[in-house]
A protein has these predicted regions:
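Trp- and acidic/polar-enriched beta-sheet ligand-binding modules for extracellular glycan
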Residues: 1-4, 26-129
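A short beta-strand element within beta-rich, extracytoplasmic domains
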Residues: 11-28, 103
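Structural beta-strand segments of beta-rich domains
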Residues: 3-5, 14-15
Length: 129
């Protein structure tokens, strides 16, 4: 594992996508710090809801959970050789409302460290936290 970042959102949402941005390959001498495989986890406090999300998702995440009440809802792979260095991926939260998310960088393209230039979580607004 290369790192993770937690997000405490100001509003509840149903996550629907994630955008990863890194410096373009054509603008750097070394692209190997770009993330490669990432996981998206959300907090689901209710145990019945957590079980439902786990049953409905079609995702297998590597490693241990990021926390007691978290479930993995997506894995994505950032492609360092793509012309577009801003890449958006759909994720399926199975309609679950959350206000906490964690993005785990599971691997990168070879460097000892990983750089994330911008990370955006997209979703359906469900009101104040």
């Amino acid at each position: 594992r290369k790192g993770q970042i937690g997000v405490l959102m100001s509003r509840k949402m149903i996550p629907t996508g994630i955008t990863i941005e890194h410096i373009p390959e054509r603008a750097t001498l070394d692209i190997t710090s770009a993330p490669r495989r990432l996981q998206v986890w959300i907090e689901v406090k209710d145990s019945d809801e957590r079980a439902r999300v786990e049953a409905e998702r079609r995702v297998i995440c590597e490693g241990e959970s990021v926390g007691k009440n978290f479930v993995c809802i997506g894995t994505v792979e950032y492609e360092k050789n793509e012309f577009n260095h801003v890449q958006t991926f759909p994720i399926n939260a199975a309609g679950t409302v959350t206000s906490k998310a964690v993005v785990r960088v599971w691997s990168n393209w070879g460097q000892e460290y990983t750089c994330l230039y911008r990370l955006r979580l997209h979703g359906e607004d469900k009101g104040p936290r």
